[in-house]
Amino acid sequence: MRAVVRHGISDIRLEEVQEPQINRPTGAIVRLTSSAICRTDLHFIRGTVSNMVEGTILGHEGVGIVEKVGSNVRNFKEGDRVVIPSTIACGYCSYCRTGYYAQCDNANPNGKDAGTAYYGGPKDTGPFNGLQCEKALIPFASVGMVKVPDEVNDSKAIMLSDIFPTGYFGADMARIKSGHTVAVFGCGPVGQFAIASAKLMDAGRIFAIDAINSRLEMAKNQGAEVIDFAKEDPVQTLRELTGGIGPYCIIDAVGIDANTSEKESRGKEGEKFKKEVEEIAPKASPHNSNWHPGNAPS
C-alpha cells in the first residue's frame, strides 16, 4: 500500500509499504477514505520534536471503512464507516473508565509513565504508524473507533478525529457557563472550533483574536467579535470592550511559536524567537521551495 513516511528532517516520502496485519484480538484494520495533515505534523517534519523513528507513517486524523476486526472486537464489523480518534487508549484501565483516555495506562508500550499514545508520533508515544496511508491498524478498536452516520460526509467527520475535540475540550476546561464572556486567541481550525464550542455552551460574548483576515472573517461569521492584534493591542481592546473587566476566560489556540505583529517582531523577543527557529529547524523551506511549513502550534 502507499503511505506518507518520515525518513528524517525534511525527508518525507510517499512510498510503498507493507499492509498492516491484526496482531492482537483487540485490533482492527481500517481502509482510509480520508486523512488530514495536522499542523502538529510540521513539528515532526521540521525536527522540532525529538525521537522520531525513521520509517514512521505520519498522520493522526482519519476516516475509513472497517475491513477486518479481531476476535475481541464485538461492537464493530466489516463495512462499518468510522472516524478514528487521534489518541490511542485501551478502554478498560482506571483512567479510560473515568474518561481520561489520553492518560491510558496500557496503550503506550513505553510504560505507564510514558505519556499519551497516538498515531504517527515519536518513539515516546509508541511509536505507532499513522493514518496518512491506505490502510491502518487500530490497536484497541472497541474504543478507538466511532461509527459515522451515512449523512455525515468525510470532510465533516474527519473534524471529529482531532480538531473539533481539541477546541471543544479547551472550552470545556475553561468551564464556560451561560452568559460568560470568552476570548479565543488564535482563529485557525482549533480556534474556530473553540469559538463554535463556546457558542454551544451558551457563552454571552466571544472575542476572537488573530491577524489573518480570512480567519477573522470566519470567526465573525460565527458571531464572534474580532480583534486584529496587528492593528490594536488585544489586552487593551478587551478591557475597553468589557468595561475594564476583561473576559471570564481565555482560550489559547495558538501555542508559543505563532507569528507576531510587525511591531513585536522587531523587538528583542521577536529577534530571539527567530534565532531559536533558525537553530532548531533550519530547513524551513527545503526542496527548492516545493513546500513552506509555517509555525506550528506547540
Q: Where does each model-flagged region fall?
A:
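Cysteine-cluster motifs in flexible loop/terminal segments that predominantly coordinate metals
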Residues: C38, S86-V146, D150
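Cytochrome P450 core scaffold surrounding the K-helix E-X-X-R motif
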Residues: R39-R46
